[in-house]
Amino acid sequence: MSDINKPFLVVIVGPTASGKTELSIELAKQINGEIISGDSMQVYKQMDIGTAKVTNEEMDGIPHYMIDILNPDDSFSVYDFKLRAQALIEDITSRGKIPIIAGGTGLYIQSLIYDYPFDDETVSKEVEQKTQLQLQKLEPLTNQEVHDYLATFDPQSAKDIHPNNRKRVLRAIEYYLNTKKLISSRKKVQQFTENYDTLLIGIEMSRKTLYSRINKRVDIMLGHGLFNEVKNLVEQGYESTQSMQAIGYKELVPVVNGELSIDQAVETLKQHSRQYAKRQLTWFKNKLTVQWFNRETMSLQMMLDEITTQINKRSSKHDCKPQHPRSSTREL
């Protein structure tokens, strides 16, 4: 299928605290767009501050999707994201608007843009239930023990995935339990046919500036009540759920339990956030063809002008109606 026959899609990526939310909202105002979150954690209710979830005030009337759709103990896979996002893109496009994906979860973005062969991830409820029971047995194990288990049947994935990346390790195990196939083998035969006419935009800046923004964002989150958010989740019994392994939550659980000081936890949280941002940038630059905009050399308005110029050229073949801009209230 030629690009002219594919739905038009704008994707905004970048590391945490780079300004994706602000750019996506301002862009949506100018191009008659609606925003789909491409963040794996913003789907969860009650996890607002630690995921830097956009507020109703910041949305400023722009529709946002894939936010607050699950409870903290619900499971959510790349395949789930792809199905929901595809339906949303179809709906948004059918109404003459432009869908904008904004987020930092690289695998989610890649699975949506390209034709991932996910057919064999559709499993029966019986198999899925058995898989979940087996995964529950792994919960008490350490990261290294879970990683060692993965290595018994998929040594290549064990080699590719760090033991501390528990989420990816568990995803590889879950894939095997559901399909009896190795996720490492699937990647080798993966197709990369583009599903959409995609304008892929990335935000970058110097490491020094990015790390400063990350540290400031953590301080802002704490000032807005991140500790109480984590405490409330722990008190509701969500401590052992997969969602609570996210950065911003796992670091503060020991504080809630009286096992660590808040100062130590904050330093760890900032360090983990900086490390995650570095991994995000590496992933995007290795896996996707991104048009990068430097936030230090370009103002927000300069980025918007350049992006809208490109969109106007490409969207002339699509039924899209640009609008006039309004201002944003977004912090970091």
Curated annotation (Swiss-Prot):
This is tRNA dimethylallyltransferase. Its cofactor is Mg(2+). Residues 39-42 are annotated as: Interaction with substrate tRNA. It comes from Staphylococcus haemolyticus (strain JCSC1435). Keywords: ATP-binding, Magnesium, Nucleotide-binding, Transferase, tRNA processing. It holds the Pfam family IPPT. Its EC number is 2.5.1.75. The keyword tRNA processing applies. SUPFAM superfamilies: P-loop containing nucleoside triphosphate hydrolases. Substrate binds at residues 16-21.
